[in-house]
Amino acid sequence: MPALSCRFYQHKFPEVEDVVMVNVRSIAEMGAYVSLLEYNNIEGMILLSELSRRRIRSINKLIRIGRNECVVVIRVDKEKGYIDLSKRRVSPEEAIKCEDKFTKSKTVYSILRHVAEVLEYTKDEQLESLFQRTAWVFDDKYKRPGYGAYDAFKHAVSDPAILDSLDLTEEERRVLIDNINRRLTPQAVKIRADIEVACYGYEGIDAVKEALRAGLNCSTENMPIKINLIAPPRYVMTTTTLERTEGLSVLNQAMAVIKEKIEEKRGVFNVQMEPKVVTDTDETELARQLERLERENAEVDGDDDAEEMEAKTED
């Protein structure tokens, strides 16, 4: 089966001042030849004078073959197919937005191309027709090329009825929903923060326990917080959630509460690692650490302080 391809958006060429994602194909005397990834790899050129605001000492330090770059369109000749681009005119904020749009548009593209492969389409025109009847409908409806289709597909995970207005056969609709669910169903992430909590005053360990319990009370039904002792005075806080941003916020809130409580008792609070999403590798290493410490402390008085503290929720 031939590899199918199609542009991401309904319009065949970008507009002047659009920020687009390109892949560098070759470097010549006049500049760099690139492929516009969102426009079915049509060719464009970044002129040498548009690579950097500073004096160019080494082109290879500014741009490399095979690398993706965010660039802005400065001229389009649709008849001749010429597209002039600039790297130096792209602000950091524009680059971030470009990367976000490209990632979401590429996800939509991957879903629809896989649908086409499952349905055994053999021509690019068939894939383009699928785009016209799905992604581009939502892009046009919401006036947000790239984002419109992505947001609609995300919504379809919980409410497939959003696809009812599309001109699709029963089989096309079924395969599309299957692929949307596989690619866009939210995946739970684990968020972790490392903190130091200690109190060398009269209340000592009781003050630490009270502060940690106050942090645990920031748990919600959907985001339970756990706190484990790594080695005094260091603790690891974790939560598992479908909402990354909310998870980070909940851990930050819990840390603020712990800090306030322990400092009321003239204790010490330090952040060793800010809240972040952790990988399976991070979790495996943490489990090994905890297991080793448990063995080392097995015969030490006060072992109960090393037990996992977990939010208790009412049944």
UniProtKB/Swiss-Prot annotation:
Family annotation (CDD domains): S1_IF2_alpha
Cited InterPro entries: NA-bd_OB-fold, S1_domain, S1_IF2_alpha, TIF2_asu_C, TIF2_asu_middle_sf, TIF_2_asu
GO (cellular component) term, any one: eukaryotic translation initiation factor 2 complex
PROSITE patterns: S1
Signal peptide (from-to): none
Reported modifications of this chain: Phosphorylation at Ser-49 and Ser-52 stabilizes the eIF-2/GDP/eIF2B complex and prevents GDP/GTP exchange reaction, thus impairing the recycling of eIF-2 between successive rounds of initiation and leading to global inhibition of translation, while concomitantly initiating the preferential translation of integrated stress response (ISR)-specific mRNAs.
Molecular function per GO: ribosome binding; RNA binding; translation initiation factor activity
Cellular location(s): Cytoplasm, Stress granule; Cytoplasm, Cytosol
Comp. bias (Acidic residues): 299-308
Ranges where the S1 motif domain occurs: 17-88
The keyword Nucleotide-binding appears for this protein: no
Modified residue annotations for Phosphoserine: 49, 52
Summary of activators and inhibitors of this protein: Activity is regulated by phosphorylation at Ser-49 and Ser-52, which stabilizes the eIF2/GDP/eIF2B complex and prevents the eIF2B-mediated exchange of GDP for GTP, thereby preventing the formation of the 43S pre-initiation complex (43S PIC). This results in the global attenuation of 5' cap-dependent protein synthesis and concomitant translation of ISR-specific mRNAs that contain a short upstream open reading frame (uORF) in their 5' UTR.
UniProt entry tagged with the keyword RNA-binding: yes
Swiss-Prot/TrEMBL GO biological process terms: cellular response to amino acid starvation; cellular response to UV; negative regulation of translational initiation in response to stress; PERK-mediated unfolded protein response; response to endoplasmic reticulum stress; translational initiation
PANTHER family given in the database record: EUKARYOTIC TRANSLATION INITIATION FACTOR 2 SUBUNIT 1 (PTHR10602:SF0)
Subunit-level organization: Eukaryotic translation initiation factor 2 eIF2 is a heterotrimeric complex composed of an alpha (EIF2S1), a beta (EIF2S2) and a gamma (EIF2S3) chain.
Protein name per Swiss-Prot or TrEMBL: Eukaryotic translation initiation factor 2 subunit 1
Source species of the chain: Gallus gallus (Chicken)
Top-level taxonomy: Eukaryota, Metazoa, Chordata, Craniata, Vertebrata
